[in-house]
């Protein structure tokens, strides 16, 4: 998340576990507040199905489904092909900023090759599709946070029943 945006919010951190985040591990979650009201979140997430293994990411979005930012934290993708998900290699990941995710069934939020509106990069399909799917699942999760906020404040970190 750009520092000029990040520093305009108050933040509270939580631990969370949910299948929409790509694995069965506990992930960090930061709820962002504006005027003492929760408005967005940053979530650590995993794209488990990258070409060369799991891709760890941060996704930030408003509760209405608008993506603030997405960044890859770590990956083992093929140099010169799949590694274009990394901001230090390519700006491909920045195309998600400002996009909206309507639902898990959002037909537009997939690669153009599969009928969606997102351009992949040359030479790779699996890696950009994995990242795209992970961002979509994570934003769907973020959109549910207002419904589980009371549970978060009670220290309950696993919410499978809310996300079926």
UniProtKB/Swiss-Prot annotation:
Its EC number is 1.18.1.-. InterPro entries: FMN-bd, Ion_transpt_RnfG/RsxG. Keywords: Electron transport, Flavoprotein, FMN, Oxidoreductase, Phosphoprotein, Transport. Disulfide bonds: none annotated. SMART domains: FMN_bind. One of its GO terms (molecular function) is oxidoreductase activity. One of its GO terms (biological process) is electron transport chain. It holds the Pfam family FMN_bind. The modification FMN phosphoryl threonine is found at residue 125. One of its GO terms (cellular component) is plasma membrane. Its cofactor is FMN. NCBIfam families: rnfG (TIGR01947). The complex is composed of six subunits: RnfA, RnfB, RnfC, RnfD, RnfE and RnfG. Belongs to the RnfG family. Part of a membrane-bound complex that couples electron transfer with translocation of ions across the membrane. This is Ion-translocating oxidoreductase complex subunit G.
């Amino acid at each position: 998340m750009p520092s000029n945006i990040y520093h305009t919010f108050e933040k509270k951190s939580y631990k969370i576990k949910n299948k929409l985040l790509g694995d069965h591990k506990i992930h960090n979650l930061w709820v962002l507040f504006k005027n003492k009201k929760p408005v967005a979140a940053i979530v650590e997430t995993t794209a488990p199905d990258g070409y060369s293994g799991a891709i760890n990411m941060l996704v930030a979005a408003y509760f209405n489904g608008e993506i603030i930012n997405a960044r890859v934290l770590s990956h083992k993708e093929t140099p010169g092909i799949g590694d274009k998900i990394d901001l230090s290699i390519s700006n491909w990941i920045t195309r998600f900023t400002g996009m909206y995710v309507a639902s898990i069934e959002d037909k537009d939020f997939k690669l153009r090759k599969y009928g969606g509106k997102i351009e992949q990069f040359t030479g790779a399909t699996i890696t950009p599709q994995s990242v795209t799917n992970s961002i979509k699942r994570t934003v769907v999760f973020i959109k549910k946070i207002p419904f589980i906020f009371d549970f978060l404040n009670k220290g309950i970190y696993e919410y499978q029943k809310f996300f079926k």
